[in-house]
Amino acid sequence: MSVVPLMFRDWWDELDFPMRTSRLLDQHFGQGLKRDDLMSSVWNSRPTVLRSGYLRPWHTNSLQKQESGSTLNIDSEKFEVILDVQQFSPSEITVKVADKFVIVEGKHEEKQDEHGYVSRQFSRRYQLPSDVNPDTVTSSLSSDGLLTIKAPMKALPPPQTERLVQITQTGPSSKEDNAKKVETSTA
């Protein structure tokens, strides 16, 4: 096997994968691009095994975390969603609970900025765990545009160590009935 094809290959071939435009058209559209924004869409559409033959799973794992606009935390105490909505004013965001879902929507009409006209809209749905009471969901918006949605988990009832047993009253004493049954079975 020769090393020459690896050293003198056309490196543009590695970039000849279908571009994923969803990264470029995400919720930050209109704020300008960074160099990493363009390259991440190329790396994200590539398989994790490069032409060199090495498996590089950290490429896809780190990009999946980076592309997510929200963070979902579920533990034994709470359900929590943190969502970056800095492009929207508080009046343009709605948070509602329907059935077992939290639905977050944001929309603002066309606005003119230095690049032209921009219109943004998003909708996200998060399924509540069965341990969460939908009536306890709260939301807060920080000054830097992070929307936090929280709900506590239902508290488990404490384990009972002692239990009172009810006594039901019956007719005649069952002691006499049991004695008659024993006599007839021995005879």
UniProtKB/Swiss-Prot annotation:
InterPro entries attached to this UniProt entry: A-crystallin/Hsp20_dom (IPR002068), Alpha-crystallin/HSP_16 (IPR055269), Alpha-crystallin/sHSP_animal (IPR001436), HSP20-like_chaperone (IPR008978)
Region (Disordered): 151-187
PROSITE patterns linked to this entry: SHSP (PS01031)
Entry's Gene Ontology BP terms: chaperone-mediated protein folding; protein refolding; regulation of translational initiation; response to heat; sarcomere organization
Comp. bias regions, Basic and acidic residues: 174-187
Tissue: Ubiquitously expressed during embryogenesis with no sign of tissue specificity in expression up to stage 16.
Top-level taxon in the UniProt lineage: Eukaryota
Record's GO cellular component terms: cytoplasm; nucleus; perinuclear region of cytoplasm; Z disc
Domain sHSP: 61-170
Annotated keywords: Developmental protein, Stress response
Gene Ontology MF terms: unfolded protein binding
Keyword check for Membrane: no
Role this protein plays: Vital role in embryonic development.
Protein family membership: Belongs to the small heat shock protein (HSP20) family.
Protein's UniProt name: Protein lethal(2)essential for life
Source species of the chain: Drosophila melanogaster (Fruit fly)
